[in-house]
Amino acid sequence: MQNNSQAPAAIAHIAGEPGSPLSGLVSFFPQERGVLVTAQIHGLPHEDGPCASRVFGFHIHEGDACTPPDFESAGGHFDLEGCEHPHHAGDLPPLFDCGGDAYLSVLTDRFAIPDILGRTVVIHQDPDDFATQPSGHAGARIGCGVIRAF
């Protein structure tokens, strides 16, 4: 795997609905064996105390817009091959809250950079159960960003 100190090929600036502190950056780095996806998210809803950290569904969606407040314009999960959830091309591991922040790095071979340009990245309010069809019962969309070439 290449070092991601190189510039990403694509990025998505994540924002919550107006007035929400949710923000972040998702970056996409081409690799020999797939795409390295990194996420740095801030302002997630969180609770303090033991066993209280939240888990959030995190996916690439097929739509090309992030219209607040519900981000329904992002469409459904991005899926190149007609697979069922959790095998959609856009199904990614969840984000784990740490005091309102989350960081993620994952290598995937489910898509190439050209496949996702103009698509959206969505953060959901609940964890993905990786079973319920068609989208994992991850709840409302609380953050969204459009993937653009960098």
Roles of regions detected by a PLM:
Residues 1-150:
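N-terminal leader/targeting pre-sequences
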